[in-house]
């Protein structure tokens, strides 16, 4: 019956839209890459910074930046260089070195699989993306080494084997034993390894943001205690591994989170990023010989380093708006700042090697993509590419951007709102809140279609109001905004989301009797939190890969925001959803990948068990072969499942 009614509804919609523009299919919403704006990649020439290059098919085109004239067009030559010459690489759990002839030398030789060398550590927190760090002169290679002997294992079920089998992963749970990390340094000429003599804090410290000095003599490491409340920026001798000195320290009663390496201007000066001193992520200039740290970017906004020369530093800033990113320059001699990007929106830029030019790739709500080049003195700016709207053949609803005051009245939380096709303010429509809300995120930007997930438009085309809003705890509104969640994940986030829902439901066209919520990961945690704390508001929810109790989440992320059950028992009790299962009133579907190695299966299965104990009905759908994120054809199946659930119970 439901499918028959849906068919009738779709036929009616098709008649109503006789302009021949299409509706999204589920495959369009999930898999159609043609609905992403075309890109126009450019890069600055290494030989002549006044030239930019663009790959056009099988040729490289070179253009004069100022005139825009084509200077040359040459075939792309695909060489076959040996990738393993004069470099280190990983081999199983060890590091090896390949000399100029390609001969392989063992740097480490551990048979114990609990000791892993040359890979990222700390589960990729603190901006860590790799484990090998060659020195500028290539005479040394620093590398991470982690000992996971004491870390507990978690079993994942592999159904592809004949009788099923277990795959055990190392998973350091909150409050339990963590990995022990060291930094080794391989001396290429001597073919020897030394380890940095790190003695700060206990052995479960974090070693983050390794940076080489320009002269390759010193390694700088931002050493963080396990509680993540104190950081020491230390210098170590590359040859001996000996501790040299502590350059600076940071302390915070909530958390310190070093995420950025140092950027050296010369051997004596470097640029340093922190949000721990002035309430926002800002850039600072430290002079080693003087022991001084000077604030460079003096704005009440979060900034991010892009590049520098000896004369200037280039950075992104959110000072125009938290939902926009613009490129600025700052003179290192007189401190003068200049905005370089033009046009509203979200800008991603690169700087020429000599610092005279920049390339700008940006979009805004109704602008799919623009690529431009400009001069850093502000005198020149020229557009070189403008993309067409890839969705022009589809019947899209208008996307609205706006803001609602946070529950504490101090901030503007930004939202995107999508109303149904042929919207009539005198009708009532079901509402879906799509939520994430967790740290390091921003769901709403003034970029093309406001970072729309096409499934949202798919649902709007089928008669739903879709609402997405960022809350306290997310990015680009300063340290206080981001750290409001400390020791109580979910509290400030829910308060803000409810402030947004109060505003939304004040409109007569929003049906307060038909409100649903959907989210994944932290958004799954938020979905179940909202369903159980505000059952009178949310009638239907779909939660994916949800955190249920922070004691089952990983050490690095979980302890930063929640600390441990020992130090924060009240916070863990208040945020655990096990005790909230009895409050579930509406229809809830939980989906999760059965081999999820981020939010392990223990979370969602434990919540289902709590619902059984409480006598509360709940629906559950596992994806046996998927990890934390469900992709490809499995994602099409997932989002159809989500859609059907709302169609069945919220329509």
Range-by-range predicted roles:
Residues 65-68, 99-102, 187-191, 238-241, ...:
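Short loop/turn segments that connect beta-strands within beta-propeller blades
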Residues 52-59, 64, 86-100, 130-133, ...:
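Beta-strand C-termini and the immediately following turn/loop, strongest in propeller blades
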Residues 20-38, 190-198:
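A short helix->beta-strand "capping" segment at the edge of beta-propeller domains
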Residues 146-153, 161-293:
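Beta-propeller domains
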Residues 32, 68, 107-132, 143-196, ...:
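Predominantly five- to eight-bladed beta-propeller fold
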Residues 39-44, 49-62, 70-79, 142-146, ...:
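Non-catalytic accessory segments flanking enzyme active sites
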Residues 9-17:
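Hydrophobic h-region of N-terminal signal peptides that target proteins for export
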Residues 153, 348-651:
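Serine-hydrolase catalytic core recognition
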């Amino acid at each position: 019956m439901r499918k028959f009614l849906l068919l009738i509804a779709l036929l009616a919609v098709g008649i109503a839209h006789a302009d021949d523009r299409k509706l999204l299919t589920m495959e369009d919403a999930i898999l159609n890459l043609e609905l992403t704006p075309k890109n126009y990649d450019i890069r600055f020439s290494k030989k002549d910074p006044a030239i930019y290059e663009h790959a056009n098919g099988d040729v490289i085109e070179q253009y004069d930046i100022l005139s825009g004239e084509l200077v040359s067009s040459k075939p792309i030559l695909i060489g076959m260089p040996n990738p393993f010459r004069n470099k280190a690489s990983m081999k199983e759990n060890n590091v090896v070195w390949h000399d100029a002839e390609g001969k392989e030398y063992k740097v480490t030789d551990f048979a114990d699989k609990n000791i892993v060398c040359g890979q990222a550590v700390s589960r990729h927190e603190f901006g860590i993306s790799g484990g090998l760090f060659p020195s500028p002169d290539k005479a040394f290679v620093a590398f991470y080494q982690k000992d996971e002997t004491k870390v507990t294992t978690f079993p994942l079920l592999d159904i592809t084997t004949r009788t099923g089998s277990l795959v055990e992963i190392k998973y350091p749970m909150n409050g339990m034993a963590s990995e022990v990390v060291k930094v080794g340094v391989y001396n290429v000429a001597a073919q020897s390894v030394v380890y940095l003599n790190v003695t700060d804090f206990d052995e479960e410290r974090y070693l983050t943001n390794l940076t080489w000095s320009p002269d390759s003599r010193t390694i700088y490491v931002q050493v963080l205690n396990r509680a993540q409340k104190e950081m020491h920026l230390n210098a170590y001798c590359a040859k001996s591994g000996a501790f040299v000195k502590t350059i600076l320290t940071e302390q915070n009663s909530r958390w310190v989170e070093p995420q950025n390496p140092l950027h050296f201007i010369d051997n004596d000066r470097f640029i340093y990023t922190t949000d721990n001193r002035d309430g926002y992520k800002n850039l600072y200039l430290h002079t080693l010989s003087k022991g001084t740290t000077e604030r460079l970017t003096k704005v009440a906004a979060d900034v991010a380093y892009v590049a520098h020369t000896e004369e200037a530093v280039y950075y992104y800033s959110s000072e125009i708006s938290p939902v926009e990113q613009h490129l600025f320059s700052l003179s290192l001699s007189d401190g003068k700042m200049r905005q370089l990007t033009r046009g509203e929106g979200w800008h991603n830029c690169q700087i020429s090697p000599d610092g005279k030019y920049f390339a700008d790739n940006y979009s805004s709500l109704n602008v799919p993509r623009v690529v431009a080049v400009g001069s850093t003195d502000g005198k020149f700016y020229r557009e070189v590419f403008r993309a067409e709207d890839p969705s022009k053949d589809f019947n899209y609803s208008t996307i609205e951007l706006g803001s609602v005051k946070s529950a504490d009245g101090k901030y503007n939380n930004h939202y995107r709102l999508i109303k149904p096709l042929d919207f009539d303010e005198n009708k009532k429509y079901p509402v879906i809140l799509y939520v994430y809300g967790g740290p390091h995120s921003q769901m709403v930007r003034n970029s093309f279609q406001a970072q729309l997930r096409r499934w949202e438009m798919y649902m709007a085309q089928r008669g739903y109001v879709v609402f997405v809003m960022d809350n306290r705890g997310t990015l680009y509104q300063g340290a206080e905004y981001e750290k409001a969640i400390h020791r109580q994940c979910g509290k400030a986030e829910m308060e803000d989301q409810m402030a947004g829902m109060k505003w939304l439901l004040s409109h007569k066209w929003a049906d307060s009797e038909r409100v649903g919520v959907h989210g994944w990961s932290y958004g799954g945690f938020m979905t179940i939190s909202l369903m159980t704390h505000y059952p009178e508001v949310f009638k239907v929810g779909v939660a994916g890969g949800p955190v249920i109790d922070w004691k089952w989440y990983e050490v690095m992320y979980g302890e930063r925001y929640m600390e441990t059950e020992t130090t924060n028992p009240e916070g863990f009790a208040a945020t655990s959803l096990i005790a909230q299962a009895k409050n579930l009133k509406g229809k809830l579907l939980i989906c999760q990948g059965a081999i999820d190695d981020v939010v392990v299966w223990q979370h969602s299965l434990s919540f289902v068990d709590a619902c059984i104990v409480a006598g509360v009905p709940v629906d559950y759908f596992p994806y046996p072969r998927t990890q934390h994120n469900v992709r490809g054809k499995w994602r099409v199946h997932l989002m159809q499942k989500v859609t059907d659930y709302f169609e069945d119970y919220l329509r």
